[in-house]
Structures are given as structure tokens and as C-alpha cells.
Amino acid sequence: MYYPFVRKALFQLDPERAHEFTFQQMRRITGTPLEALLRQKVPSKPVSCMGLTFKNPLGLAAGLDKNGECIDALGALGFGSVEIGTVTPRPQPGNDKPRLFRLVEAEGLINRMGFNNLGVDNLVENVKKAHFDGVLGINIGKNKDTPVEQGKDDYLICMEKVFPYAGYIAINISSPNTPGLRSLQYGDALDDLLAAIKNQQQVLSQKHHKYVPVAVKIAPDLSLEELIQVADSLVRHNIDGVIATNTTLDRSLVQGMKYCDETGGLSGRPLQLKSTEIIRLLSQELQGRLPIIGVGGIDSVIAAREKIAAGASLIQIYSGFIFKGPPLVKEIVTHL
């Protein structure tokens, strides 16, 4: 397959520059006959989850296409779902560069992007132009300069704007790169946020005459006690799904490697075991009351099967896709 050669060239570039270059090329060929070069035939393996039918269980995780610029090109690769974002009410530049690092030996990434995006209105315009026939997830967050106490307002603003266009909405309260954001995962702050989100979902469902499920994305760095509390809150508020997990602050598996001490969230192979364990514990606690979307270090068929065996109904990839490329999509969907 051609990807090892493409990867070699891309890995000569700074990681963020490589990402920008790739998206530039994808945008250039979308809607032209060259788009056929991206298209991969994958088997149909329908899965029902959150009241939606997914063409197959494999999705692209949020963070790769923050502004919804390459939905059709990514969809052509065979994903059953594509999750775009994280998007915030207002555009923001994110953290200072450099803010994305490859840990090549570990097949991991560290990022401290900080929700860099062009704002929810820009994303909605891009979504309107897309023709992807899979499930489109839209991941929403709060602006960095919005006080955490008013954070729920940012989620409600984004919900209202994306609701007519989303297959499902993902609530990101677990990025380590927005100060104070992870505090929304705990106790009264979480209950307050979930109550507001559920109320907004009901209001918007009546307004638009359609139901859009809401999933909450959680961190892998929760203690067992915290995880049990989160699970209890999700069930009490009738949230439709949980995405487990976001990136980790734990560096125990990458000690001594280049960039291991960079601030930010670690993803990829070093996150694999930790995220699978969170899924297993969450599954035990939830007892099937809401579905789990498993993400974190999936880079092979076996890693994908482990997530499903632990209790995930759907799975997503990101870092594995960077390191293994489009062939990973076909390989996982074919052999799941």
C-alpha cells in the first residue's frame, strides 16, 4: 500500500504542518474525479446505537477535522461515522505553537492544541455543503475565555446551532488543554451541566421535530470512585451515550522518549490499555443502560476487538489513523 511512503514524507514535516498540508490536498480533490483515489470499499456491517444506524462500528474521533472541512473526503475512506470538532461558540486560535508532538517509538501523540477552531457558525456552513451518508457527530466545547461557571452557556449555544445538522452531539468536558474544563466532570458541576443539556435537547427536539442523541466524552484519568459517580450522573440525566476516552496526562509508559515531558494530552498506543480498562469498568457500572463508544490507542483489529470485548458498542480511531493511514480503516471494518 502507498501509505508508508506518504507517511515517510509527511513525518519529515512538523506534525501540525503535515496535518494542514494533508487537509489542503483533501479539500483540493473533494468533488473532483480525483476523489476516487480516496474511496475505499469496506463491507457493510450495520450497528444500531443511540437510536441511529451506523454503516459499520468504526468512526473517526474528534480532533482531526475540527472545522468540518473534509467530511466527504474522510467519509470516502470507509468510516461509519465521522466526528468533527471540538468546536466552540466563537473562533479561537488555541494554544501557542508548537503544540503537537509525535512520539514515534511509542506510536503516540501529545497535543495541547487548546480547541483551536474557526467557530461554530463556520462549522455549520461546512456541514451544510457536505454529502457524507454516514453518521455525523459534532463535538462541542467551551471557549477558553468563558469562565468555567458559565461554561454550560457555551455548550447550549453550540447545541442550538448544530442540532439541525448533527447525527449526534458529543459534549467534550475532558480535554486537558482548556483550563478548568475537566472540573465539569465532577459532582454538582456535572449534574448542573447535564440537566441543562438534557433540557436543551428536549426543547430543540420539539422545535426541529427530530431527536439528536447526546454523548458525553470522558477522561481516562478518573479514579474508580469518580468513574462510578460519572456513570450514575449520565444514567440519572438520561444521556444517550458515553465516549471513553479522551487523552491522558499519564506519562508512565513513555518515560525517556523524546517529547515525553511536553505538556498536553497523550493519545495513541500508550493510551490503549488505560482506555480499555476505563471502558471495562464503565461497562460493569452501566450494565447496558447506555452505550459506550470506545476510543484510545486503537491501531489494529485486535485492539479494536479488545475495546468491543470490554463493552464498547462502537469504536473510534485517531492516532492509529495517523500512524497506519487509510488501510487501517478497511482492515478493522473487514475483520471486526
From Swiss-Prot:
Which cofactors are reported in the record for this sequence? FMN
Q: Provide the residue positions that the database annotates as binding substrate.
A: K66, N111, R112, M113, G114, F115, N172, N177, N246, T247
* Keyword annotations of the record: Cell membrane, Flavoprotein, FMN, Membrane, Oxidoreductase, Pyrimidine biosynthesis
Q: Pathway involvement?
A: Pyrimidine metabolism; UMP biosynthesis via de novo pathway; orotate from (S)-dihydroorotate (quinone route): step 1/1
**Topology in membrane:** Peripheral membrane protein
Report the top EC class in one word. oxidoreductase
The positions flagged as active site in the entry are: S175
Q: Give the catalytic activity.
A: (S)-dihydroorotate + a quinone = orotate + a quinol
Q: What is its EC number?
A: 1.3.5.2
Q: Which GO terms describe its molecular function?
A: dihydroorotate dehydrogenase (quinone) activity
Family note: Belongs to the dihydroorotate dehydrogenase family. Type 2 subfamily.
Gene designation: pyrD
Subcellular localization, as worded in the UniProt entry:
Cell membrane
In the record, biological process GO terms are:
'de novo' pyrimidine nucleobase biosynthetic process; 'de novo' UMP biosynthetic process
Q: Where does FMN bind?
A: A62, G63, L64, D65, K66, T86, N139, N172, K217, T245, G268, G297, Y318, S319
List the NCBIfam families hit by this protein, alphabetically: PRK05286.1-1, PRK05286.1-2, PRK05286.1-4, PRK05286.2-5, pyrD_sub2
Q: Which PROSITE patterns match?
A: DHODEHASE_1, DHODEHASE_2
Any one of the GO CC terms? plasma membrane
Q: How is the cofactor bound?
A: Binds 1 FMN per subunit.
Q: How does it associate, per the subunit comment? A: Monomer.
Protein name, entry field: Dihydroorotate dehydrogenase (quinone)
